[in-house]
Amino acid sequence: MSKIVAVVVLAAFCVAMLVSDVSAKTSISVKGESNVDVVSQINSLVSSIVSGANVSAVLLAQTLVNILQILIDANVFA
């Protein structure tokens, strides 16, 4: 089930990037942490899906939050 959710999240991100003018921002500042490289998070998520491993719910949630933060920063929902 988590693999399906992960694929849907990644597909939604790809569609949002194609439809809107999202900048090439690939890292965001997370409170209490250094910059998070969202591209490496997505690569890790895709690798987990392709290898057939269970997708960590924490990784999925963090990736989704970071993708949403980039989309919000780019005013996609405005």
UniProtKB/Swiss-Prot annotation:
GO CC field: extracellular region
Oligomeric form and interacting partners: Occurs as monomer and a variety of oligomers. Component of the apisin heterooctamer complex consisting of 4 copies of MRJP1 and 4 copies of apisimin, associated with 8 molecules of 24-methylenecholesterol; apisimin forms a bridge connecting two MRJP1 dimers. At low pH multiple apisin octamers stack to form filaments that increase the viscosity of royal jelly; these filaments may be stabilized by bound fatty acid chains. The mandibular gland, where royal jelly is produced, has low pH conditions favouring filament formation, while the higher pH of the insect midgut favors filament disassembly.
Signal sequence annotation: 1-24
Glycosylated sites: N54
Phylogenetic lineage: Eukaryota, Metazoa, Ecdysozoa, Arthropoda, Hexapoda
Organism: Apis mellifera (Honeybee)
Protein name as catalogued: Apisimin
Tissue expression from the record: Expressed in the hypopharyngeal gland of adult worker bees peaking at 8 days post eclosion (at protein level). High level of apisimin-mRNA is found in the heads of both nurse and forager honey bees. Expressed in the brains of adult worker bees, peaking at 12 days post eclosion.
Keywords: Glycoprotein, Secreted, Signal
GO BP annotations listed: multicellular organism adhesion to substrate
MF term (GO), any: sterol binding
Domain of life according to the entry: Eukaryota
The protein's role, per its UniProt record: Major component of royal jelly, a substance produced in the hypopharyngeal gland containing proteins, free amino acids, fatty acids, sugars and other nutrients, which is fed to developing larvae by worker nurse bees. All larvae are fed some royal jelly early in their development but it forms the principal source of nutrition for larvae destined to become queen bees. May play an important role in honey bee nutrition. However, its role could not only be associated with larval development, because high level of mRNA is found in both forager and nurse honey bees.
Subcellular location: Secreted
